[in-house]
């Protein structure tokens, strides 16, 4: 975040940004910052060839969390979330990213920043697939066989009894 962006946001959201202006200047100016939907936009708008986040690129428009939720499928209630990292989790006005194993990455506000939280600790009501992300089904790694030198040698079988 630079001075120009902060000034734009102060005009755009005076009641939300203005009360935190000093904190933002002291802690976030000169660094990367994101609100909840900004985490998703930052990933979707990222240009790997330049290393930049290019506004409204890669097919994703500049939308808010509720618009994204209301305009996509598949989605479901939070109790049906599949174990797919990268899904979004949502409740009205807020969105986070499910990273698997019951964990979420979310932007929790100006003073807290971006944090990892437990899925069960949030007020999440639904999950969605983000249409600008390609989900790849993971295949489990095959188990490696036990090395031969660690196997116990088998006892030799007793000889067959000899008949007279």
Where on the chain are the PLM-derived regions?
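N-terminal capping segments
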Residues: 1-52, 92-94, 105-107
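Aromatic- and glycine-rich peptidoglycan recognition patches
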Residues: 49-83, 92-159
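Long, low-complexity repeat tracts used as extracellular stalks/passenger repeats
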Residues: 161-164
